[in-house]
Amino acid sequence: MKLQSGVAEFGQLRDGIHRAVRPDGVRIFVKVRHDMPADFFLAEARGLAVLSSAPLRVPDVISVWEHGIALEDLGRGRASARDWENAGRGLADLHCSAGERFGLDSRGWCGDSTQDNTPDEDGFHFFAERRLLAQGRRAFDRGLLEHDDMRQLESICARLCEMLPKQPPVRVHGDLWMGNVHACANGELALIDGGAVHYGWAEADLAMLTLFGEPPASFFCAYETAAKIDKTWRKRAALLNLYHLLNHLNLFGASYLGGVRTVLRRYS
């Protein structure tokens, strides 16, 4: 592996995930994927750079190359109630950073799926075309969705402006499930895995935080106190999470089909 010649200690945590110690004693976290395109880890490095100016901690990028990335090792600890409150305020601050358009100047990755970030001034069109329909068409082409499913999805996309409030494009993580909120060695919470970062809807980040488990109530209370956001956002979370359910359907197969269809029936 490319980095091994420059480290004093090197160990594998699991396939493609390594911890190492440099000769100067700095601990680093290394991810390697030879099965992904060259921009996979570049997207993560770019995303972490976009997030880095916000109060929420992100790992420093030490090195990135065609098939890997070396990051600051944040360690692993346990977050306190105060840490969660600080993270809520930090995410609110992140979402205060507005962009001129939705998207980003390069494509991203949500898990192992490419994410089209072609900039768009219309958030409803961006979410429909670059998120919902992109994943829906991929699933249909692979035989995971049927014609009726696509008709329902297209109906939803045509009426997004009736079901969701108009929101500005703000800096978002884009893949903000609980697994990407990391408790550092000192308990401080950090955002990791930045490949899906773009300018999008703040509500979409909040919604995904409720998809696979969720932070304590104090996190959301701190967020809502600090942010200018419609506090009824939870009512729209299922619709916003349809993107991630479709993505999981494409990545992991039919076990996610029931969840996708539940949302399609509810909103179509």
Predicted regions and their residues:
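Juxta-kinase regulatory segment immediately upstream of eukaryotic protein kinase catalytic domains
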Residues: 1-6
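ATP-binding pocket architecture of kinase catalytic cores
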Residues: 9-18, 22-125, 129
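Short strand-connecting beta-turns/loops that link adjacent beta-strands
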Residues: 23-25, 66, 185-188, 242
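A general structural signal marking secondary-structure boundaries and capping sites
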Residues: 55, 95-102, 139, 164, ...
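An alpha-helical support segment within catalytic cores of ATP-dependent transferases
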Residues: 99-172, 184, 266
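Active-site Asp-x-Gly
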Residues: 121-128, 137, 167-171, 178-238, ...
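Hydrophobic alpha-helical segments that form the core
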Residues: 238-246
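ATP/Mg2+ or Mg2+-diphosphate-binding catalytic cores
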Residues: 248-268
